[in-house]
Amino acid sequence: MSNIAPLLDRNRAFASAPGARQGMPRLPFIPTLNLYIVTCIDCRVDPAQILGVKLGEALVQRNIGGRITPAVIRDIAYAGYLVDTKAPEGPYFEVAIVHHTDCGSTLLADDELRHGFAQRIGADERTLADTPVLDPARTVRTDVERVLWADEIPENVRVSGHVYDVGTGVVTTIVDAKGRK
């Protein structure tokens, strides 16, 4: 049996439940909270659990460390463009970046492991050296600035930065929502 089999059973229960899809956004890709969350792939950092995000409320993008990369910038720019063109009368669109304590990306700080991984996937080792979330408050500030300074990001986008403590379960705001400079 596949590892996803129990989840497919849950999906059938979800799909058949009355009102399961209520509260979905009126327009595709524009979440009801005008929120885009970028966070880590770590299974302990699920926005639905730690923030109570419900279906249709936010776009969620996950990658190693929840770091802002050129691909993430492009995706945020696309979402911001959709909001700009399809719902220009709406409120600003917020990107919430959430890093966390005890992040597995710290393993990429190990020179030998990072070198081996870079060789295996054909990645630039210098780029991987910038990935580890050793100090989540520092890295989330850096990533907020990366979004704010990206030319592709529309003016309607605000960015905030947060740190989730996996030990306490508390999310702390490090950078309040702010717009481009």
Model-derived regions: residue spans:
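Divalent-metal-activated hydrolytic enzyme cores
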Residues: 1-32, 65-68, 73-92, 102-181
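N-terminal short beta-loop-beta anion/metal-coordinating cradle
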Residues: 16-55
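Short beta-strand segments
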Residues: 38-40, 62, 96-100, 162-165
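Gly/Ser/Thr-rich loops at beta-strand to alpha-helix junctions
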Residues: 41-44, 101-105
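A glycine-rich, hydrophobic loop/mini-helix early in the fold
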Residues: 43-73, 77
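The start of beta-strands in P-loop NTPase/AAA+ ATPase cores
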Residues: 57, 94-95
